[in-house]
Amino acid sequence: MAHQAHAYHMVDPSPWPLTGAVAALLMTSGLAVWFHFHSMYLLYLGLTLLLLTMVQWWRDIIREGTFQGHHTPPVQKGLRYGMILFITSEVFFFLGFFWAFYHSSLAPTPELGGCWPPTGIYPLDPFEVPLLNTAVLLASGVTVTWAHHSLMEGNRKEAIQALTLTVLLGFYFTALQAMEYYEAPFTIADGVYGSTFFVATGFHGLHVIIGSTFLMVCLLRQIQYHFTSEHHFGFERAAWYWHFVDVVWLFLYVSIYWWGS
């Protein structure tokens, strides 16, 4: 970025939005190829390009915000509104899945046997792995808040410990979810129950992976002394996102696992 005599957000030309879009195209195409032709090459190519884009884009943002001082108060205000709008859009994204679930379950059609869960579907016990997953995510919400308070108080060591614990809990949740999927007595092909269950919980799982990655970057930055007690914008946004993921899971648990079973 050239020298500027104002505090406003002027973004340098960047290739990363384009490479990110190409990665998204390759991954969605790769997913279709994997489903129909059992080949994962295109999917792996998309994932590799996405990984490279993430690393380079994060590097640029860190350089601009931490080392060049471009994240002035007006810039932070704009980024804050951007994150609020992004999370709002995510709320509506998940609202569509809940709508589909309740539309199907509150008035089951004769094709489903007139009951919910549909005839022949054996739902998962909500008081086994799903309840453990709920406890894990709620605990991670506590640890991320602990990390935030430690950061604001200038307690570097505790912030690192709490953030490490949060990331580990995030990955533990993902492992439990993968195990649950592997052992589930129904598949995504099992009618409206299977599709609403796997799409809603699957997209939530994807958001947990994204949030865990976001927090892992924050952990690495905290270890590198990038955050101060006054300026830790990236961490705050990651914490917001993590709390959003927590709340979505509570709705999923109550709706799909507990009430829906």
From Swiss-Prot:
Assigned keywords, A-Z: Membrane, Mitochondrion, Mitochondrion inner membrane, Translocase, Transmembrane, Transmembrane helix
Subcellular location: Mitochondrion inner membrane
Tagged with keyword Transmembrane: yes
Membrane topology category: Multi-pass membrane protein
Record's signal peptide: none
Xref: Gene3D superfamilies: 1.10.287.70, Cytochrome c oxidase, subunit III, four-helix bundle
Stretches assigned to the Mitochondrial matrix side: 1-15, 67-72, 153-155, 224-232
InterPro entries registered for this protein in UniProt: Cyt_c/ubiquinol_Oxase_su3 (IPR024791), Cyt_c_oxase_su3_dom (IPR033945), Cyt_c_oxidase-like_su3 (IPR000298), Cyt_c_oxidase_su3-like_sf (IPR035973), Cyt_c_oxidase_su3_a-hlx (IPR013833)
Transmembrane segments: 16-34, 41-66, 73-105, 129-152, 156-183, 191-223, 233-256
SUPFAM superfamilies reported for this sequence: Cytochrome c oxidase subunit III-like
Topology, Mitochondrial intermembrane side: 35-40, 106-128, 184-190, 257-261
Keyword Transmembrane: yes
GO molecular function: cytochrome-c oxidase activity
Family, as annotated: Belongs to the cytochrome c oxidase subunit 3 family.
Record's function text: Component of the cytochrome c oxidase, the last enzyme in the mitochondrial electron transport chain which drives oxidative phosphorylation. The respiratory chain contains 3 multisubunit complexes succinate dehydrogenase (complex II, CII), ubiquinol-cytochrome c oxidoreductase (cytochrome b-c1 complex, complex III, CIII) and cytochrome c oxidase (complex IV, CIV), that cooperate to transfer electrons derived from NADH and succinate to molecular oxygen, creating an electrochemical gradient over the inner membrane that drives transmembrane transport and the ATP synthase.
Name recorded for this polypeptide: Cytochrome c oxidase subunit 3
Species for this entry: Squalus acanthias (Spiny dogfish)
